[in-house]
Amino acid sequence: MLFRSTFLIFGDPQIGCSGSIDDDNGGWTNTLNHALAKAPNANFLFSMGDQINAYYKYDTSNLSQVEEEYDGFLNAPQLTQLPLATELGNHDCGYNTALYGQHFTLPNISEKYGQVSGDAYGDNAVDSESTGDGDYYFTYNNTLYMVLNTSCLSIAEHKAFLEETIQANPDVTWKVVSFHKSIYSVASHVTESDIVTLRNGLSPILSQLGIDIVLQGHDHVYARSYIMGGESGMTADVQKNADGSALTEVTNPDGVQYITMNSASGSKFYKITEEAFEYTAVQNQEKVPNYSVANVTKDAFTVTTYRSTDDSVVDTITIKKSKNGWETVDGKDYWYEDGVKQGTEGRGKEIYDPESDAWYWLDSDANGAKAVSKDVYQESDGGKWVRYDANGQMIKGWNTNENGTYYFDPITGAMAHGTVEINGKTCHFDEATGILK
């Protein structure tokens, strides 16, 4: 499996919102140009919804306006170069039109979860595939991307979708959720009733499911939250530098990182509200179109946001996963502590794994791999022989193999030699081999 990928993230292009489709297309195309120049090896594009502005004010008699806006979005030549993932924004799901689903092909789209009432689409609502209505997911390399339709306010549906999708994709390193309506933003939408419903409902679920990062749009402003811990709010982790600025790197955070993307076209910007939200780590509004570059590896997920005018950095955040515990590589098990492989210091190392409640030996002769079915001489406790079974666990008590019967101390694991008193009985073991006589 490949472990490195790059994708580009764009907040609401909302073509047509400024009143000039041509101007909005120009801004959108310019941002795409800058993004692809910054990350020429990007693997795909990800739009946070509201690709167009049409909304529900246009009925079936005025679909030409809607199509002109879609043309303004899709005619950007860069969209022919890479796959494009989109979200259903509130401006995309207008009454009496199912055009969103007719313009975008979405993988693994649910016909059970994330549905909006058919009334929102009038007589054109047929199924999820034709409307683009419904939660969906895709995987790329080591990452699972789950896209929720936040025009649907059923928390139960979104929860079921997330749980079933995660269960069906157990071997990913990163879990990303994306949806249009930002629940941790700094613009005026954040206090509206639908956003409050989504925030109160989704936040604890996303934390419980171990989601790493949430990508959002809707508010045409840039905002990055602190690491959020669901119902308990911000996690207890220290999240500021000594000078009070927000951290730009966190390791093994106990919570979820939320990022809200600014407009990618410049068709509309919102003001940052006067209210100071305690969950906000970074906020920015310069009325300059933004784009974000996400770089994903096995150990780190970095999102850096840039201004499309000069490619200067607005903000960056890196989430690192420092390995702790066992990791299997090429059929061998290795033990990590704070991301550092143990047992490679020129001599072996005994470690205790609380999850299995057992002791193991890391064999320096095998680059720190777990010793299995092996007798090991350890210099601790004045020197002792210890045996590890086929699972690598230290053997304690009586043990028999093809050579004979042995006894290992129930606390230290030391092989018995000579005459030993065991449970009130005198036992004699070979001084050299430890075999019971």
Model regions and ranges:
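Extended active-site neighborhood of metal-dependent phosphoesterases/phosphodiesterases
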Residues: 1, 59-173, 201, 227-282, ...
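Acidic, histidine-bearing metal-coordination/catalytic regions of metal-dependent phosphoesterases
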Residues: 1-17, 38, 297-322
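N-terminal active-site segment of His-dependent metallophosphoesterases
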Residues: 1-59
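Active-site-proximal beta-strand elements of phosphoester/diester hydrolases
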Residues: 5-17, 142-151, 176-180, 257-263, ...
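Active-site neighborhood of phospho(di)ester-bond hydrolases with catalytic His/Asp-centered motifs
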Residues: 9-11, 44-50, 82-90, 148-149, ...
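Active-site environment of divalent metal-dependent phosphoester hydrolases
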Residues: 15-19, 52-56, 88-97, 154-156, ...
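Active-site-proximal segments of metal-dependent phosphoesterases and phosphodiesterases across multiple
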Residues: 56-67, 172-216, 224-227, 232-235
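Extracellular adhesion/carbohydrate-binding repeat motifs centered on closely spaced tryptophans
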Residues: 322-437
